[in-house]
Amino acid sequence: MKKFVGAHVSASGGVRNAPLNAQKIGAKAFALFTKNQRQWSAKALEEEEIEQFKANLKAAGIAPSCVLPHDSYLINLGHPGEAELAKSREAFLDEMRRCEQLGLDRLNFHPGSHLGAISESECLSRVAESINLALEATSGVIAVIENTAGQGSNVGYDFRHLGEIIDQVHDKSRVGICIDTCHMFSAGYDIRTREAYEASMAILDREVGWCYLKGMHLNDSKVKFQSRVDRHHSLGMGELGIAPFEFIMNDPRMDGIPLILETIDEALWAQEITLLYSLIKE
């Protein structure tokens, strides 16, 4: 059973530092922002930065397929406004190209929000069209849609939404999903008992399909079941407890993909990584 656990590490001072930061906490996978996530534009990646990133990744012994970059929080690929949608699509394409340059094969993103101006279905179609445009203009990078907690007007809280987006994506080989444990719990998919876990995962398989799972975010939840609020907590300190993470660490369906902590206390990441590996039953 091959599990690749890590965390969303800092790329402060340049993306080259991210693999080193991952290595320091004993990670076998990691997530990063390839640019400032709170700004629209960023200067292009320099060749030296790209080469150093690849060298550090190799030195850390982490495969490119175990890196799950996250796009900017500003991007809304389902935006109801035409000008804003175009701006988001341009920014997303830039992020896809950055992944391409860094030799990474996936980019994780939140699907988007309808902002109360269009229907959920229309929003999902816009997200799918945004993905199609980005895939046509790039090669080799998979667009990885993350499930959401369903806060505000965010789409993607219902697994059916993820399936609906994928149905409309032309190149199915370059689209996938990332499942966040905190988000799914907050959206109404229970995973606290073995029975609940299997039932929720069966819904995921039915609505989307296991073949599309390209990563997971392992987070406990500060908020109660079905609260539709996105508040992460450290493992075992929130409403989920340790059991769901034991189920995941012993589930062969989660083999070979990046399993990423986005828990709130980064001082605990090394401990949490050790804890997760200790849950594996031989």
Curated annotation (Swiss-Prot):
Entry-linked SMART domains: AP2Ec
Q: Which reaction does it catalyse?
A: Endonucleolytic cleavage to 5'-phosphooligonucleotide end-products
Q: Which cofactor does it need?
A: Zn(2+)
Q: What is its EC number?
A: 3.1.21.2
Residues that, per the record, bind Zn(2+) 2: 146, 180, 217, 262
Q: Which GO terms describe its molecular function?
A: deoxyribonuclease IV (phage-T4-induced) activity; DNA binding; DNA-(apurinic or apyrimidinic site) endonuclease activity; phosphoric diester hydrolase activity; zinc ion binding
Q: Which Gene3D superfamilies match?
A: Divalent-metal-dependent TIM barrel enzymes
Q: Record's Pfam families?
A: AP_endonuc_2 (PF01261)
Residues binding Zn(2+) 3 are 183, 230, 232
Amino-acid positions noted as binding Zn(2+) 1 in the UniProt annotation, renumbered to this chain: 70, 110, 146
Q: What detail does the entry give on cofactor binding?
A: Binds 3 Zn(2+) ions.
Keywords of the record, alphabetical order, are:
DNA damage, DNA repair, Endonuclease, Hydrolase, Metal-binding, Nuclease, Zinc
Q: Which SUPFAM superfamilies match?
A: Xylose isomerase-like (SSF51658)
GO biological process annotation, one example:
base-excision repair
Q: Which InterPro entries match?
A: AP_endonuc_2, AP_endonuc_F2_Zn_BS, Xyl_isomerase-like_sf, Xyl_isomerase-like_TIM-brl
State the superkingdom: Bacteria
Q: Which NCBIfam families match?
A: nfo, PRK01060.1-4
Q: What does this protein do?
A: Endonuclease IV plays a role in DNA repair. It cleaves phosphodiester bonds at apurinic or apyrimidinic (AP) sites, generating a 3'-hydroxyl group and a 5'-terminal sugar phosphate.
Q: Which family does it belong to?
A: Belongs to the AP endonuclease 2 family.
**The name this protein goes by in its record:** Probable endonuclease 4
Q: Gene name, please?
A: nfo
